[in-house]
Structure formats: C-alpha cells, structure tokens
Amino acid sequence: MKLAYWMYAGPAHLGVLRVASSFKNVHAIMHAPLGDDYFNVMSSMLERDRDFTPVTASIVDRHVLATGSQRKVVATIHRKDQEDEPDLILVTPTCTSSILQEDLGNYVARAAPYTKSEVLLADVQHYRIHELQAQDRILEQVVRHIMDPERQKGTLDTTPTPTPSANLIGFFDLGFHHRDDSRELRRLLHGLGIEINSVLPKGGSIPDLHQLAKAWFNIIPYREAGLMTAKYLEESFHIPYIDRTPIGLIETRKFIGEIEAILQTRGVDRHEYYEKFIIHHETIVSQAAWFARSIDCQNLLGKRVIVFGDCTHAATITKLLVRELGIHVVCAGTYCKYDEAWFREQVNGYVDEILITEDHTQVADTISRLEPAAIFGTQMERHVGKRLDIPCGVISAPAHIQNFPLSFRPFLGYEGTNVVADLIYNTFRLGMEDHLLELFGGHDTKQIGESQMAESISNSKGCQWTPEAEKELAHIPRFVRSKVKRATERFAQEHGYPVINLECIYLAKQSTSVDIETIQHLLFNDETEVQ
C-alpha cells in the first residue's frame, strides 16, 4: 500500500463491490469510514443504470470506535436481509477500516443463522492486492461458496447441455466497454451455434451458479477477472476454458479455432461451416480487413506509437496495431505487475520496449522521451497526451465517462474490430486538426494560433525565446512544432544558451537534422490528411 494521487487500479474493496453490484439480487455491506463510500456515486455516474447500486455503508464513526462494531454490523446485515431479501449478502471492510483489526468473520458468523440470505465475508488482503485482483478472487470465492456444498453432497447437476454451450465469465459493472462486449460476444457465439449457459457476474444471479457445471466450456474474455473461477471449474468439473480475447481479425480467427478444437473433442465437427463463417465476416461484415488495405491506412504504416493499459487490452491492441495495420509500437506496457510474465510473452517481438509499472510518472516520462505520433492508453495517458500535444486513444480502464457510451461500441468480435479501427484512425487524424485550421484558415484562426503559441512558449522549462525565434517557430507546422520546440530547448540547455535566438534554432536544426526538407517530408508524405 502506498500514498498516491493517481492509481491505475483502485483499492481491493472496489473489486468486491463491483462483483456484488454486477450480480442480480446480491447486496454488499461495506464497513468503512466516511470518505470510502464513494462507490455508489461513481457507479451511478458511469454505469447510468436505472436501479440503485446494491451497496450499503456501515459507517465507522466515533461512537463505533468507542463501543465496537459488532452490534452495528450485525444489525445492518439483519436489516438488509429483511428489506431487500437478497440471495447473498457480501460483507467487506475497506483498507481504512481494516486498520481496526476487527473480527468481521465472527460478526458474520453471528448474523448468518438469523438471516434468510447467504452471508459471506470477502476474503481478501486489502493491503496486498488491488481492485482487479480482488474482483477475480471474490468471484471465485462466491462460486465456491455456492457450488462446493452441493458438489460434496453429490446433488449438483453436472449433466452437459444437449447442444454446445458456454459460460461467459468476467463481465462486471464499471468494466471497460463490458456491456457492449457482452452483447457482441453473445452475437458471435450465436452465429457459431453456441448456446449461452450462464453469464457471470454481470446480469447473472446466485441461482445461475447451480447451472455452471452443465456448460461444455467457459470463455474468459479478460485475464484480469474470471480466470480463477475458470480454473476452479476446470479442476472441479473438468470444464475446459478459453482465455483468448477476440480483439482484431487474427485473434478472433484463433478464438473461433479454439472453440472448434473443443467441439471436436466432443465429436462435433464444424470445420467447414466455421471456415465459411470466418471468410464471410472478414470480407463482408467487418470493414477492418478492407480498411487495412486502403490508402488511408497505408499512410499509417511505420507510425510510432505507445500502448499502455491492463494486460488484456494492451497486449491485444499492440498485436493488432503491428500485425494488421503495420504501425510501429515503440513501447507497450501494463500496470498489472502481477501478470508481468504473461504480458512479456504476448508482446515479445512486437515492440521495442516493454514497460511494467504502476507509476504514472514513469509512463509520462517514457512518452516524453520517445515522442510517439500517438498514444493508446488509459485516461491518465490521455491527460499526458494533452499536455505534450500528442493525440491519445483510450483503449483500457481506468477511463472517464466518455468510455461508458450509451451507443453500441464493443471492442470484441467483428463489430469490435470496426470500432477499434475507427479509434486508431481517428486518433491520428484528429491530431492534424489544429494544423489544418492554421494552414487553411478558420474562425479566429490567427488569434487562436497566436494565443496557443504564446502559451506554449510561456510553458517552456527555463528557456526564454526571442521574438524572432518565436516567429521562426510559428512557421513550423503544428503537428511537428512541439517536437522541434523540445529538441531546440534541449539543445539550448546542453550548450548553455540562456536565451533561444535564431542562431540557436539553426544550430539545433543542424545537430538534430530537423531541417526544412525533413519538415516537408513529414508534411506531405507522413501525414494522412495532407494530400
């Protein structure tokens, strides 16, 4: 645990609450002080569901600190059991209330005999793991809690469904495009002739857990949550699982191939049908294959980008950029340090550098050092891109409200491939808008350009520019101006120029090979919008 003003993944109790709020008729009781109870507000703002978030805060105040928490926690459990009649009540402390070292397990044990609902204490180390790890562990804990007693008594129905079926495990509230990904994956499986046995936890219920063992296989679209549940089902009921994420045409084809292989082990051969299905969707349904061969996409060849996010999205987007669009990924990274080995294995050979860190300042420093043409990352990388004047597309959580759209925008499957291709192309294209306004004119272009230039110069780190130097810098196209400006300032600091004048600019051009021919090459050959 460390103090930080930005975290890529939240504290563990957020993962617990996301599991509870994703299920139908499951209620969470959070034992926490005021200040830790922001989940309801955050969930209401981002998810925009019609229903209230099923989370109740058992507030730790001065009275509780003086008399103990047992009476309050037990009373809250009994009250929510009577009011809401949930199938399961999930009790969790937060990292703050864990400092009190209270025996919440004992409180739950005292309350459970007098409730109609199942009551379960979230078994996670709040100081050792973060949000993504917690939701993975808690989902597995809930599944075990429901299925193990029936399995031990031999009353659990494990008869496979008569036709091929799958469990979709790993869709959560506040997940990055999870609602739309779930719809698209259902549609893809329907086209492949696969029935949906259960979906967990988003949209699922506790009674659905009794049916999990009837599926032919499990699908885990995101490594961050659901993998522990899939491994438990494989060990206990011998149900295979697929953990490949179908983002991009190549990965979607491999995903379908893994489904075909599982069906063949059950004596079902659909090879010919699946081949026709893939060809039809790659040539007609998905526009991404055609787009990759278009002149617009050809202009993206060799572009230098940085990718950063969770393991699943960072790895799959990196491979899509390199294999399907020919874009040069100079650095790919993830904040999921616990899954570093898998991530390195996935992106090895596709990138120049690999960055594994939870520190957003290291990511910002890497972006500043490598100066890519675009960034594909989280909301934090979007902020960094705005500061450095580098366009950024958000491809991973954490994200803001614009990445919880009301419209249908999946990342998985063939429709998701179209969405991702649009995101990639528009990220580059929008980076040219300011320059095109400057070049061809627009409303108040001159005033806007001058004010932005003045702001840019005023933000220089310890470097003063003469009016002549500012005028010369203004002649450089906007999309490479910030790069030329940083290179010139770096040259001035290294060679002891207190003020940047025309002589300093010309010497910097010579030393870094940033001359007029280079700028013209960038302007007329390297950018997509200038023909």
Curated annotation (Swiss-Prot):
Top-rank lineage group of the source organism: Eukaryota
Pathway stated in the Swiss-Prot or TrEMBL entry: Porphyrin-containing compound metabolism; chlorophyll biosynthesis (light-independent)
Cofactor: [4Fe-4S] cluster
Transmembrane segments: none
Entry's Gene Ontology BP terms: light-independent chlorophyll biosynthetic process; photosynthesis, dark reaction
Binding locations of substrate: 431-432
EC assignment: 1.3.7.7
Keyword Nucleotide-binding among record annotations: yes
Pfam families for this protein: Oxidored_nitro (PF00148), PCP_red (PF08369)
One annotated GO molecular function: metal ion binding
Subunit record text: Protochlorophyllide reductase is composed of three subunits; ChlL, ChlN and ChlB. Forms a heterotetramer of two ChlB and two ChlN subunits.
Family membership: Belongs to the ChlB/BchB/BchZ family.
Biological role stated in the UniProt entry: Component of the dark-operative protochlorophyllide reductase (DPOR) that uses Mg-ATP and reduced ferredoxin to reduce ring D of protochlorophyllide (Pchlide) to form chlorophyllide a (Chlide). This reaction is light-independent. The NB-protein (ChlN-ChlB) is the catalytic component of the complex.
Record protein name field: Light-independent protochlorophyllide reductase subunit B
Source organism of the structure: Nephroselmis olivacea (Green alga)
